[in-house]
């Protein structure tokens, strides 16, 4: 059984808040859908045996969880090969994702969020001082480490090429994002999307929305969405990504950021949504000065 978008959003919310008191307004507010529409869709879901409402408690049934499985995120690919030169001297002897921020490694905030969402198939593509990532195995014994031997000769598209065959219903994540709100990583996703927060003006990488989908990916923009390096790709889009990455990379496109392929060069092949988050959900630490402002031990 295929779910409509509204049905998915309702069930996704309910499964993350199992056995909650039935409050139509709360559901409506959380998923940004009118109460009337939520009520209508809940009636359909209940008649289909996907949700159960009894004694003012609402929950997703076992059958409902089976239906949600088709939207399950299967794995996460984390790109961690870069040097992080702007973070020197903190990155002199370790990669940026392993830098401690208030006694927590940056990458741990992402790994903990993934594991909390029951996404345990995690591949980390390493490069600069790649052997240092072995220390993660003590806390995260199931992660897989894959080395990109040409990380310093190409852009991060080469890291994607290193694990190309593993693209399938997966998150693609940058490793140097400090996750303040782990709930931005969810177990289920309906369609291909990229995290973004609304901004009146930015000098950083950003995009706009056109008919509901990402458009005008560029550096610097107004009335736009800041690009955050956490995206999800469906099975169908993963297949297209594999073909498009191969075509671009094998024809001299070794110096592209990987996201340029689906968002710019081959954008007509994709319809990628913006999954909105708040600026405070993710902390981007771009340089050593910003690190000092967040963690006084570096001053």
Stretches found by the model and what they are:
Residues 65-76, 227-299:
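Conserved alpha/beta core of the MobA/IspD/sugar-nucleotide pyrophosphorylase nucleotidyltransferase superfamily
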Residues 134-205:
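Conserved beta-loop-beta/alpha segment of the NTase-like Rossmann-fold superfamily
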């Amino acid at each position: 059984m295929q779910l409509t978008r509204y049905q998915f959003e309702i069930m996704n919310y309910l499964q993350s808040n199992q056995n909650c008191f039935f409050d139509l307004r709360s559901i409506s507010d959380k998923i940004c859908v009118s109460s009337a529409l939520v009520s209508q869709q809940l009636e359909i879901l209940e008649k289909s045996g996907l949700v159960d409402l009894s004694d003012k408690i609402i929950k997703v049934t076992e059958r409902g969880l089976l239906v949600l499985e088709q939207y399950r995120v299967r794995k996460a690919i984390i790109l961690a090969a870069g040097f992080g030169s702007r973070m020197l001297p903190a990155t002199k002897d370790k990669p940026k994702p392993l830098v401690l921020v208030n006694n927590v490694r940056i990458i741990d905030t992402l790994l903990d969020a993934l594991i909390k969402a029951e996404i345990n198939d995690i591949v980390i593509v390493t490069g600069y001082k790649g052997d240092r990532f072995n220390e993660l195995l003590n806390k995260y014994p199931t992660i897989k480490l894959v080395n990109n031997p040409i990380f310093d000769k190409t852009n991060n598209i080469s890291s994607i090429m290193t694990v190309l065959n593993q693209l399938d219903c997966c998150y693609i994540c940058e490793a140097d994002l400090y996750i303040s709100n782990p709930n931005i990583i969810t177990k289920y996703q309906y369609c291909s999307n990229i995290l973004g927060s609304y901004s009146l003006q930015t000098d950083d990488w950003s995009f706009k929305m056109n008919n509901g989908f990402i458009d005008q990916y560029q550096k610097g923009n107004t009335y736009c969405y800041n690009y955050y390096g956490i995206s999800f790709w469906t099975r169908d889009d993963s297949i297209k990504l594999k073909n498009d990455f191969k075509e671009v990379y094998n024809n001299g496109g070794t110096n592209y950021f990987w996201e340029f392929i689906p968002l710019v060069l081959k954008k007509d092949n994709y319809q990628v949504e913006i999954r909105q988050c708040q600026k405070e959900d993710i902390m981007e630490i771009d340089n050593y000065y910003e690190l000092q402002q967040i963690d006084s031990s570096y001053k």
